[in-house]
Amino acid sequence: MGQASIQRRAGRPRRTATAAVRASQPVCHLCGLPVDLTLQRTGRGKHPLSSCIDEIIPVIRGGSITDPANLGHAHSVCNN
């Protein structure tokens, strides 16, 4: 099992880091516009401006998914 597989199963530490990033970073780190936390999934998937968490340094390149310093708050559309 690779490092990416192991880290993706981080569970609670990942959720804790994600919650911290959403609370402390109210703007998209990619475009600089505010992220509306009330936008949720629609019947056909995510709203384009809904919240997602982006790995600044991908796990495959040694980044951590449990370190808030490596996570950025983004719009779904900006992160794709």
Task: Report each predicted region and the residues it spans.
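Cys/His/Pro-rich metal-binding microdomains
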Residues: 29, 72, 76
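Histidine-centered nuclease catalytic patch
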Residues: 34-72
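Short, charged surface segments at domain edges that flank catalytic/cofactor-binding sites
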Residues: 1-40
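Short, intrinsically disordered, charge-balanced linker/junction segments flanking boundaries
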Residues: 78-80
